[in-house]
Amino acid sequence: MELQEVLRMNGGEGDTSYAKNSAYNQLVLAKVKPVLEQCVRELLRANLPNINKCIKVADLGCASGPNTLLTVRDIVQSIDKVGQEKKNELERPTIQIFLNDLFPNDFNSVFKLLPSFYRKLEKENGRKIGSCLIGAMPGSFYSRLFPEESMHFLHSCYCLQWLSQVPSGLVTELGISTNKGSIYSSKASRLPVQKAYLDQFTKDFTTFLRIHSEELFSHGRMLLTCICKGVELDARNAIDLLEMAINDLVVEGHLEEEKLDSFNLPVYIPSAEEVKCIVEEEGSFEILYLETFKVLYDAGFSIDDEHIKAEYVASSVRAVYEPILASHFGEAIIPDIFHRFAKHAAKVLPLGKGFYNNLIISLAKKPEKSDV
């Protein structure tokens, strides 16, 4: 099965769907919103081509479920709020928003929500139906999506940790795994494995910046939020807990060791310094803002029961990783993986060691020399 076919969230609206298990991401989006407003404010000051008539925006790696339109709402509200602050504003610009993700993404679940979303925009923002136009642009964000110099603003949240492919060199010529017992570039991975993952991330992120800089107008903006490495040596991110759960099944005899050793996630969690260095090395963008912050896995969860919290965290992670796990290990073992995941989560949550480190970076496309 092709990798792109399983790089998606759980679709639909069932108990294990991303739509039902993505409340955590709403907390991240709330943290990003003030930075988004400032980014839009700077964008509207830049006087880009046609921006007073139609602002063209894309959400790269939009996923599905209510969070997709929550992101859209935040973008629209930010544009309208900043627009109201401008003097002599005569008319709101039309906003054209493209939702991007891989072809298997459950776009239909998003489209079903659009009629009520448009009505809500009209009621709460006074935006007439037709003044905000939302469509899909499926495809990999590591490839060209839009014409040259056609976009004003690109947004992406929690997507850049996904690589375009599993790094090469993780299996020797004799077919032996160089990342035994691990499923990504973890703290336990050998240095050659860590280098292979960093090299793949560097290649992919450089491609991402180059391609999308070509799609943006000069002075266009890009706002990226991603998971990043922290400095805490004993903290456990969700993939660490997932790795521990799968290893449990091997030790218990429910899963062959070879099955674990032949599995590597196409995921890399960069440090803030790595992201900064790649942006500077690629050269198309100026860094306007960079911040890191933590969000606990169970933040915003009101029930004070560690086991219920752990099940909640397990469901959130399952909604993200089930498709790719099921394609390799089979669907039957998925409940067992996340049952053990919840047990590990229940141990780290009371200690405050279960959280994501996050990075927000705001970028502006540098002008061409002829524009200066």
Curated annotation (Swiss-Prot):
Its Enzyme Commission number? 2.1.1.158
For this protein, the record's SUPFAM superfamilies field holds:
S-adenosyl-L-methionine-dependent methyltransferases
Q: Which species does the entry assign this protein to?
A: Coffea arabica
Site annotation (Involved in substrate discrimination) points to: 155, 267, 331
Residues binding S-adenosyl-L-homocysteine are: 18, 62, 67, 101-102, 140-141, 157, 159
Q: Spell out the Gene3D superfamilies in the cross-references.
A: Methyltransferase, alpha-helical capping domain, Vaccinia Virus protein VP39
How is activity influenced by pH? Optimum pH is 7.0.
Pathway, per record = Alkaloid biosynthesis
What's this chain's function? Involved in the biosynthesis of caffeine. Specific for xanthosine and could not use xanthosine 5'-monophosphate (XMP) as substrate. Catalyzes the 7-N-methylation activity of xanthosine, but does not have 1-N- or 3-N-methylation activity.
Q: This protein is called what?
A: 7-methylxanthosine synthase 1
Enumerate the residues binding xanthosine: 21, 25, 158, 161-162, 316, 321, 356
Could you tell me what the cofactor note in this record states? Binds 1 Mg(2+) ion per subunit.
Task: Write out the residues that bind Mg(2+).
Answer: 179, 261, 263-264
